[in-house]
Amino acid sequence: MTTNLKLNCDMGEGFGPWNMGDDDSIMPLIDAANIACGGHAGDPSTMRNCVELAKSHKTEIGAHVSYPDKQGFGRRAMDINGRALIDLIHYQIGALDGIARANGTRVAYVKPHGALYHVMLADVGVLNDIMTAVASWHAELELVVLATPRDRKTLQLAVEHGLTLRY
């Protein structure tokens, strides 16, 4: 078994004239960029800038999807599940994937952000909805999850959805 360690970082978390983080300095140091897709942060121009930067440094692009919570930076859990959550995730992946493809690259994986990530770890139904969204995307994407004592259930769901997981 080969273990492949990739350093990832949350990127593109500003919007409009407001910047957060030093994406220009960090991008050359990482293997994978979790780019905000407009839910907790990010806007079309910020996403494009990050995609161009990632492409120039041969950094993998990940969709950093979240609850629609810019005011709380995606850290507030929301009662969104089922079809509404799947649609929300498709919407955010679609925004980033469209910008990536317009710039000659693509999204390789999905990493939920903040409260959505933590709810996913605690609620198998939300995990299943996220996996459904990622698996039903038109391109093969991997899903980033945290290694937890519940790994067997997570792995079982991933197999059922035909997904590859990243830890």
Which positions does each model-derived feature cover?
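Catalytic beta/alpha-barrel core
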Residues: I35-H40, V119-M120, H138-P149
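Glycine/small-residue-rich loop that forms an oxyanion/phosphate-binding "nest" at active or ligand-binding sites
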Residues: K70-G104, Y109
